Amino acid sequence: MEYRKLTKEEVAHLEQVGCAAEDWDRVMVHPNINIKYLRNVRFSGDCRIGKFEKAFTMPGGIHKHSGIYHATLHDTTVGDDCCIENIKNYIANYDIEHDTFIDNVDIILVDGPTSFGNGVEVSVLNETGGREVTIHNRLTAQEAYMQAMYRHRPVLTERLKGFAAEIVQQYTAERGRICHNSTIVDTGYIKNIYVGPCSEIEGAGKLKNGSLMSREDSPVHIGYGVIAEDFIVQDGSHIEDCTTITRVYVGQSCNLGHGYSASDSLFFCNCQEENGEACAIFAGPFTVTHHKSTLLIAGMFSFMNAGSGSNQSNHMYKLGPIHQGVMERGAKTASDSYILWPARIGAFSLVMGRHTANSDTSALPFSYLIEKNGETWLAPAVNLRSVGTIRDAQKWPKRDKRCREGRLDLVNFNLLSPYTIDKMMRGVEVLNQLRELSGATSDTYAYQSAKIKHSSLERGIELYRTAIIKFLGNSLISRLEKSRDLKPKHNDGEGDWLDLSGLIAPHSVVRQMMNDIEAGTIATHHEMDTRLREIHSNYYEYEWEWAYQLMLRFYKLREDQLTNDVLIRIIEDWKRAVVGLDKMLYNDARKEFSLSTKTGFGFDGNIRTAEADFEQVRGQFENNPFVTAVQNHIEVKTALGDKWIKELS
């Protein structure tokens, strides 16, 4: 855009209305500027000012015309139709794009060169260091997982640091940018901050060395009292209500609020953190905590809900806060739970009470960990029949608030996948071994510093087998709907599987990608990201390759024995498994409508009043949306199974 110098008449008028400049020749303006919208402005350095033709409509119906009033600008460019007023100190070294509104701010400056939060090292999991993740504007949960968890591959670690360094260099500058249609009001200190398009900063206390990666279709909001230093906030996220973050990465569509405090932590897409505290955590997608008394520390989580008063310890008062823990995807904690790290909690498990025995229950997913008389008791697989587990699995895709385009984190929502089914296979093996070693008549069994009741062990084996059969039937029918040729053309999906903080993939495929990164075959961050997205998009091909081999092993078949009669038997097993699990869920949901749950209803009446009050508030069991969904699921899956049995007969 071409700018012009101010005329002598314009300079004289500006000086009459309180404007001043170190050198008016260094103040360039839009050819069509109306200088009546400049009042009490001090210029220094090289400044460029756009035109003022539009007005902003504020809440309450008041209109403010674009212009610059009561401000000091140094080496700053202001785009068209901006309104900047009441800057107590100054704005320095910024390019402010069109249609931006800035009012009642203390100071906005860049003291460069700066990378706007890019390149900050976050000490996740181990407070004393050793698993640092370099944050940058394109960071994904999967890249961060590899940075943090693969320190046993130092060449890979160095390559990943190199990829990050390239991006950091791209974003390093001596000038800041406030992109178009942004709003900054009632804010204190802003230093070395990149402000993306349509950002909203209202009442923030202090923002230093960070990036707001806002987008037009997915704006960022920073609210009152927020203090943030050395950070990156991705699009769609809201940081509100006196939240304090230091050395923190906030992924897409996250909410941090109600005085939340976090340091040296990573929060990936759709996390919700309120009231509590986080230190050195790796919060994968959908990590949620809402309670003041909850501390998450030195742990890795994903698809997790922390109950009130949930705490962990990473310090044994010997060599410092050096311990860490993992709660695999879907694991959650009940109120007042406590875990002494190190520990590893199996996927989709529920932790209740205090646990100090450093257990590893990763081979027994979907379990309850219960404290009884100071000991950890394990109930394997019981979460498979919990209505809460299925409700969680259904709500996560619905609560993904990210825009369809430009999603960074790769998220697989499947509850039953090769990752969890392989763990169930190992779980059956573990439980059978315990039964053989201790005897089938033992009352209790010891595993990983935990105790398992005989009845819990037997029930766990049965539930795991039922879930495995359900998964195999799901995969078989999905394959039949695509092709009658069941034999996979490749074997990439065979072997064990990993969960890279949301991305579920075969270990062999991930390992090959890492080998290619180390060898330089994958030479840039973009190439790595492309490979990860290819792996994610090929999930169902990989899944069938794995499920096909498991089906042969589970049913003790050779490939030439996969006749239609055998497939019919597998589908019949699947029907029984689906209906059986759904009936368990149905019965579990019924407990929420028992007489005891009606306690406290019908305050001033009798039992009939309580029942009527309960129905008005909670509804009837038969009409509950989840209950009707379970009933419909039974009908739909039964019909689907019957259809394929008929076609194969």
Regions found by a protein language model. Give the residues of each.
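Well-ordered, non-transmembrane segments within structured domains
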Residues: 73, 173-223, 228, 444-457
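Basic/polar N-terminal segments that are highly enriched at the extreme N-terminus
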Residues: 1-2
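Glycine-rich hexapeptide-repeat left-handed beta-helix
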Residues: 5-6, 12-21, 29-68, 72, ...
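Long, charge-dense tracts
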Residues: 89-90, 94-101, 106-116, 120-123, ...
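Long, compositionally biased intrinsically disordered regions
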Residues: 105, 372-649
